């Protein structure tokens, strides 16, 4: 059943576990995510970006999610707009049936971010929709979001406290050292867990970890074995994800891992049978690989068996 984002995350916040927020761009990805939720008895945070909405069409995206909710009525599901860049984009998502939206004004100055977030919160709350915002800036590239290393800034905990109090946002994504994409760290992975814990203490709301793909060894191997190139890639270690949840993270965004796992299987089929053109032969193993990544993440973060 489709529910407000806060309905899922407040429970995670109170009970101290994390919920994976999984991006989709087509039916195959969505189907695999729902199958994983069903098999692991986990609530689902389904999200899609402005770029993916442009690709699928917003009515199609919402329609597919609603259809899957009818197939699995026992699973609490939030449909979330990831990285909404404007008020209009968030409003469009709310009107289309999303139950959670993110307004990402983190590239603006604090006061501008606060003003725009507050405007979105008022609009969304009037419609019964939850809102996420971001403070600090994550390095990396995701859809139309691109931030250089010199522009990446970690969150200020006191500013986070003020921001949450004044905006009344439902959950916050604090920048603590992760980055978008497959190339998250130049040296050894490092996240500012002390900063995270202070933000949690001062805000006392669900927190979100962006740039949280791990690029697990088995997924990396499958991609490389199929002829892919991930030179220099480095994800967030599993133990860091677990430590983040202990420090107050309740929503863990995951996109890159899903893409890599899916495409690895498509490449594999293409390499092994160059005469193959039955799409089902490509997408069936790709869905299974993606589902396994999602199931593993649900168990790691603690959302398995939380329905």
Curated annotation (Swiss-Prot):
Record-listed dihydroxyacetone phosphate binding positions? 181, 211-213, 253-256
Assigned keywords, A-Z: Glycolysis, Lyase, Metal-binding, Zinc
The free-text note explaining how the cofactor binds reads: Binds 2 Zn(2+) ions per subunit. One is catalytic and the other provides a structural contribution.
Q: In which pathway does it act?
A: Carbohydrate degradation; glycolysis; D-glyceraldehyde 3-phosphate and glycerone phosphate from D-glucose: step 4/4
Record-listed Zn(2+) 1 binding positions: 83, 180, 210
Cross-referenced SUPFAM superfamilies: Aldolase
Any one Gene Ontology molecular-function term assigned to this protein's record: zinc ion binding
The subunit field of the Swiss-Prot or TrEMBL record says: Homodimer.
Instruction: Output this protein's name.
Output: Fructose-bisphosphate aldolase
Q: What species was this sequence derived from?
A: Helicobacter pylori (strain ATCC 700392 / 26695) (Campylobacter pylori)
């Amino acid at each position: 059943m489709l529910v407000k984002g806060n309905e899922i995350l407040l429970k995670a916040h109170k009970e101290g576990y994390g919920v994976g927020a999984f991006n989709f761009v087509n039916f195959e990805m969505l189907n695999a995510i729902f199958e994983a939720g069903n098999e692991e008895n986990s609530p689902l945070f389904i999200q899609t970006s402005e770029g993916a909405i442009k690709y699928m069409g917003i009515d199609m995206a919402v329609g597919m999610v609603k259809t899957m909710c009818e197939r699995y009525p026992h699973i609490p599901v939030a449909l979330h707009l990831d990285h909404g860049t404007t008020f209009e984009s968030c409003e469009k998502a709310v009107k289309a049936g999303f139950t959670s939206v993110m307004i990402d004004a983190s590239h603006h100055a604090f006061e501008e971010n606060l003003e725009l977030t507050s405007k979105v919160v008022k609009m969304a709350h009037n419609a019964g929709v939850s809102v996420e915002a971001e403070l600090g800036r994550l390095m990396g590239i995701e859809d139309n979001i691109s931030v250089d290393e010199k522009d990446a800034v970690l969150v200020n905990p006191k500013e986070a406290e003020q921001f949450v109090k004044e905006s009344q946002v439902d959950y916050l994504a604090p920048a603590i050292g992760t980055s978008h994409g497959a190339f998250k760290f130049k040296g050894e992975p490092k996240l500012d867990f002390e900063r995270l814990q202070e933000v949690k203490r001062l805000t006392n709301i669900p927190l979100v970890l962006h740039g949280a793909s791990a690029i697990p060894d088995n997924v990396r191997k499958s991609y490389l074995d199929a002829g892919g190139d991930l030179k220099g890639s480095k994800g967030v270690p599993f133990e860091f994800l677990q430590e983040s949840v202990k420090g107050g993270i309740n929503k863990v965004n995951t996109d890159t891992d899903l893409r890599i796992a899916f495409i690895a299987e498509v490449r594999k089929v293409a390499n092994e049978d160059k005469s193959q053109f039955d799409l089902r032969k490509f997408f069936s193993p790709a869905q299974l690989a993606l589902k396994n990544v999602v199931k593993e993440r649900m168990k790691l973060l603690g959302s398995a068996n939380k329905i």
